[in-house]
Amino acid sequence: DTMTHMLSLLPKSRFEESGVEIPGGLAFLADYRPDAIAEASAGIEGLFMPPSHPRLDADLLARLGSVRIIQTAGAGFDSVDHAAAAKLGLIVCNSPAQNAITVAEHVIGAVICLQRELAYADEAIKSGAYAQARERILGRGACELFGATVGIVGLGGIGRALAPRLAAFGATVVA
């Protein structure tokens, strides 16, 4: 069957770079203008899109015609007007916890940067204020994840990925 059934708003290069075989029946669109999406969706049953853009508002959803399902490529799917989709009988799906490990690792990196004032130190050193930065950071003492108590609000995919990583640093995790 060479008919196109799915339209991907994710670039074809994302599929190619990951080494996955691109199935037949999948077309790609790099133009996120509402008119272009509506036109490319003619005869399409499913729409595959990035989690945060483009915005699928009630007007655009009504113009999607034969589309029955919208799948986002991440946990977030607030770029789709869910009330309008429900009225049109569209199924909207996300990929929960898809990026949970990436986000958990980013959180740990951000916590360490904040604890050690790395952004401040970087800027101070670049502007020639090394002595002041050194005095400020060393003056307040060591700040470590080891022995710290860290609270996690919510144990969804990200929280569940974050907890053992924090524990590996020797932190006590409270959720």
Residue ranges and their predicted role:
Residues D78-L90:
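Rossmann-fold NAD(P)-binding glycine/threonine-rich loop
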Residues S8, V150-I152:
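Hydrophobic Val/Ile/Leu positions in short beta-strands of Rossmann-like dinucleotide-binding domains
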Residues D1-P51:
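N-terminal glycine-/charge-rich "phosphate-binding" loop or analogous flexible N-terminal tail
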Residues I158:
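Hydrophobic/small residue at the entry helix of a nucleotide-binding pocket
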Residues P50, A73-G74, L90-I101:
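Short beta->alpha connector loops at strand-helix junctions that form conserved
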Residues L88, P96-T149, A161:
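Phosphate-binding beta-alpha-beta segment of Rossmann-like dinucleotide-binding domains, i.e.
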